Amino acid sequence: MSTNSGTEYLCRENHPWAAGVAAGCVACLLALSGCATHGTSRTGRGLPKSAYPVTPQTNVVETLHGVRVADPYRWLEDENAPATKAWVEAENKVTFAYLAGIPEREAIQRRLTQLWNYERYGVPVKQGGRYFFSKNDGLQNQSVLYVAESLDAAPRVLLDPNTLSKDGTVALSGTAISDDGQRLAYGVAVAGSDWQEWRVRDVATAQDLPDVIKWVKFSGASWTKDGQGFFYSRYDEPTEAQRLTKVNYFQKLYFHKLGTAQAEDVLVYERPDQKEWGFSGGVTDDGRYLVITVSQGTDPKNRVFYKDLQAPGAKVVELLNDFDASYNFIDNDGPVFWFQTDLDAPRGRVIAIDTRAPARRNWKELIPQAAETIQGVSAVNQQFFVNYLKDAHTQVKVFDLGGRFVREIPLPSLGSAGGFSGKRSDTETFYSFTSFNTPGVIFRYDATAATSTVFRQPKVAFNPDDYETRQVFYASKDGTRIPMFISHKKGLKLDGRTPTLLYGYGGFNISLTPSFSVANLVWMEMGGVYAMPNLRGGGEYGEEWHQAGTKARKQNVFDDFVAAAEWLIANGYTTRARLAISGGSNGGLLVGACMTQRPDLFGACLPAVGVMDMLRFHKFTIGWAWTSDYGSPDNAEDFKALLAYSPLQNLRPGTRYPATLITTADHDDRVVPAHSFKFAARLQACQRGANPVLIRIETRAGHGAGKPTTKLIEEAADKLGFLVKTLRMSVKPPE
């Protein structure tokens, strides 16, 4: 189906600690030695309370469901207020002075830069006989979009986002290529904002057309078969003062005809009676239908409507009109639609629905639920390519259109594979493979010969064979079996005091799978252990696993993470003082909750762009959409559960909390920075002892998507330097 992306307002991060930076690099000298000795840092690591800016407290108290709740730092929610801007400047001054004073930081940043400097390719997409792909030469702030007339032809630059801003903070946020390969619709985002502006470029000339589409958020674009226009979703224009904080309701689906002004765009579908509904429109490959996926917040359950584009005056048909399961459209054979669904199958199955006889009794199951969890399905070469997760690593199986198993596609090792896009008539497809020690390799799959060949493989400045990964299973507090990946250098002596970084997420049906990260590699080079458990709330084992970590069951996620930490200590990897935890967005909430519940268990904490005020998250931008996972503070029962773990409300004065580096960004309009601002102010006030409490506030940056390479490297260097100092590691300087 010709579409870019759907409603992507998941509470999710993209930053140096999130495994998933496809990598490789040119040859360079080893800058840091794997030498995690247990000596004392060359400088003191503590900060007295007098080092922090004075943060005024105001007398703001609300009574919520009979409970009086104080919110003395609410004034920090106004990011445009002069007082807030002054506070940000003062906090950053303290933070960056502390980080700059870490002797090892310069060498760490140098090594990060060396390892980041390699060619990285995206998975190619074929449209109209042309091949489109992204490529980053190494240290470019943004990847460049290329086009080639054939696989053997020299590619040419189609769109270079690096030319759109001097500091690299204007990023490509989405692309959609017309069926004939003649036009490119593309979205750009400024300073990491979720707001996008869409434009159109002629592929032959690489020149923009006059078309400009504004106020797009959580939407891709999907071209009509004739390439004369595309469908997209948008919100009403906010005022400038409310652009980063206004709640986003009433998304609408439009059609834009090339060569016309946005004011002339045709409203295709809206629901004034359903303010929380979001719409993603995709045109089927045969061009006949517009398939409308209807979502409500981040709940994976959705409805599906469609419109016959070949029938003049056709109305929107409500095909699946209940939020009873997830239905992901795969492709169609005329009036027969194929879906991946978890209806009566929490790990997923594939069904066929004939739109001429859509009653549920007429549905046909093509691929039944398996022991593994379906992550995605595509239709290429008259076959289904099904991406499964088996204990959080990828398996890819091929079935014919009748659902009969054909073969499994061999993968290099335990890791993650993604891609396999294309049309049903295509005889080739492309996919990427990555693992903790393998930067992204692009493969071309010949569907006729059933063979994979390496299409692009990065040249790396380290030996992947120097590292090893194992998967263990441990028992959580309630006995649930939880998987965890553990990676480190081969031959690493585990003496029970090895610096260890524990990373987690656990929410929104999102699966964490093995993936390469430059920051994680440098951590392991320095002798650290990297551990990543697959917590409940994620999607690794299907919808039941997801639901086990939501709403009143959210505490399960924190228990799973704490149990992972205790397992690492009990099994001789590390000590409490040398164990750090990290997570972003929903993972930032995870870190905040665990450090408030078990401040004794960790040596350092790195919460990034976290949801810290669980009593007010629903009042900003798209926060209301997360109630499917968190519950609503407006509901008395949900409020009780939220108050029990909300990081901001559970900080206690006079408690010795771990050394903490909070990270956020001034343009984050998904998890607004007020969450981190208020948490930092409260934590600094509550902290007993000299463990530092710092907040690093990135300027001209958002939730993480599109962050330029320079900022990614600087942030990773700051975090690694902070861990080296607070965990008392000794790192050998570069030779």
Describe each PLM feature range.
Residues 519, 526, 532-735:
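Active-site-proximal cap/loop segments of hydrolase catalytic domains
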Residues 162-178, 186-193, 204-210, 404, ...:
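Cap/lid segment of the alpha/beta-hydrolase catalytic domain
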Residues 129, 180-182, 226-228, 288, ...:
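Short coil/turn segments that connect the beta-strands within blades of beta-propeller domains
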Residues 147-148, 199-203, 247-259, 304-309, ...:
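Beta-propeller blade signature
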Residues 36-38:
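Bacterial signal peptide processing site
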Residues 136-143, 165-170, 188-197, 212-217, ...:
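A flexible loop/linker signature enriched in serine peptidases of the S9 family
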Residues 32-34:
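C-terminal motif of bacterial Sec signal peptides marking the signal peptidase cleavage site
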Residues 82-176, 187, 277-308, 313-332, ...:
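Non-catalytic accessory segments flanking enzyme active sites
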